[in-house]
Amino acid sequence: MSAVSEIGVGRLHRTLLLGELISYSRDSNGDAVVWRSTSDPTNSAKGATVDLSEVGSPLPMRVKFGYLWTTLGNPDHEIFDIPECDETDRRVLNGGSLMVNVSAPRAVENFLDMGHFPYVHTGLLGIEPRTEVVEYNVETTDAQVLATGCKFYQPVAAASAAGGQVTEYTYRVPHPYCVLLYKSVHADPSRMDVIALFNQPMTEERIRAHNFLSMVDDVSSDNTLKHFQQLIFGQDKTILENQFPKRLPLDPRAETPIRADKSAIHYRRWLSNKGLTYGVVAAAS
C-alpha cells in the first residue's frame, strides 16, 4: 500500500484496494494501522490528524521490505521472502510509487519482457542492433514462476554502471501481482541486485506500482538510485497505459507469442491455473 517511511504519524492516508476505499496511518509508536474507510473517525479528511483510538476494526497488515501490506480477506499464508534483504551491506529503499492506468497482471508481464529493452529503454537497458533474446529457462511451481539464464546486452545496466555489459537476469513471480528481478552487479559479478515491482491493484485497470530496490552499491546516493529507477519505469508507464485491453488476456490464442514472451506465457498459464479473475480477461471455456 505504501512505503512505511512515507506514512505520516497520526496523519490520515487513503487509497484504493480492489476497488474499496482503505485508510491507514501510524500511531505515536510508529506502528502502522489499516482499516476500511467506512470506519474513519467522524469528519476526518485525508491528510488530517486522526485519533487512531476511534478507528473501528483494523484490517490484517504486515510491514515487510519497508512497505505496508494489507488484505481484505484472511489469508492462510505469509508474504513471500526476499533473503537478500537480510544482507547488511545492501541499500534497501523504495524507488518510487506511481499510479498507472493498467491492470496489475499487465504490469507484471511487461516487467518480464526483455524484448522491449532496445526500443523502450534505448541507450540504457538495450540498444539496436543488439536485440536478440537468447534462449532461457522457465520453471513453474504452485508458489512461483522462475526464469533463469536470461542474458541481455545493456549500455547502462544500473545507476553505478561505467559502461556496457551483458547482464545476467533471473526473474521471479512469487505472487500474481508482484515480480522480482535479480541482475548481476557491475562491480561484483558474484552478487545480484534485486529490483521488484509490488503492484497494488486499486481497481481492475488501475494500479499503484511500488518500485522496490535492494542494491549492492556503495557509490550512488539514494536519490541517484531512485532517479534511475523512476527514469526506467517512467518509460514503461507510457507503454503500459497504451496497452489494449488493459486487463491481461489469459487465452493463449489472444496474442501471438515469440521467444521473448516465454516467461509471459508461463505466467499467464500460472494465473489461469490459480483461477485468478481480477485484472485479467479469462480464457474461453
Model-predicted regions and their roles:
Residues 17, 76-285:
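C-terminal catalytic domain of Rieske-type non-heme iron oxygenases
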